[in-house]
Amino acid sequence: MANMLAISNKAITSTQWGWKPCESPHYGIKVMSVASLIDKKESAVIYKGPRKTNLIKRMLKETFWGKLDFLLIDTPPGTSDEHLTILRLLKNLNPDGAILVSTAQKFSLNTIRKEISFCYKMKLNIIGLVENMSYFVCPNCGTRHD
């Protein structure tokens, strides 16, 4: 995502109000990412349990977003501690709901069913579903690539 938004060489900065997210020069989209917090971009981030939960809390509570029209949170597929932590932290804000993202492959079907069940059990509205990596049409020649 950092490459698509042209922020791969930008770092999160700390201000008196909290962390200042990176901002895409092309789209004005503010991005807060673990990748922007580490010095070596090729390093793996291996956080588990409480350390991961604390980082999520800090990213949500200590980031100075300014005025937002909406907040998108990119999470790993499935239903995990990350999802529970985020939902617990945002519950008082009464989020409008979730936009689920899946791929067109058959193995993704079970995962998306679990995510739908998770949203239902947590009383979180599903706003929509995005099918990712289905195909693209070349803007130069018009050829469809699956």
What are the language-model segments listed below?
Residues 34-40, 94-97:
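A short small-residue
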Residues 1-38, 53, 57:
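Phosphate-binding loop that captures ATP/GTP phosphates
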Residues 11, 21-26, 63-66, 91-94, ...:
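Solvent-exposed alpha-helices and their adjacent loops that cap or buttress functional pockets
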Residues 37-89:
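Phosphate-binding/switch loop-helix module in NTP-utilizing enzymes
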Residues 70-146:
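Conserved catalytic-core segment of NTP-binding enzymes
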Residues 8, 46-50, 143-145:
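Short, flexible loop segments at the rims of nucleotide/cofactor-binding pockets, characterized by
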Residues 3, 61, 120:
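Short polybasic/polar patches that bind polyanions
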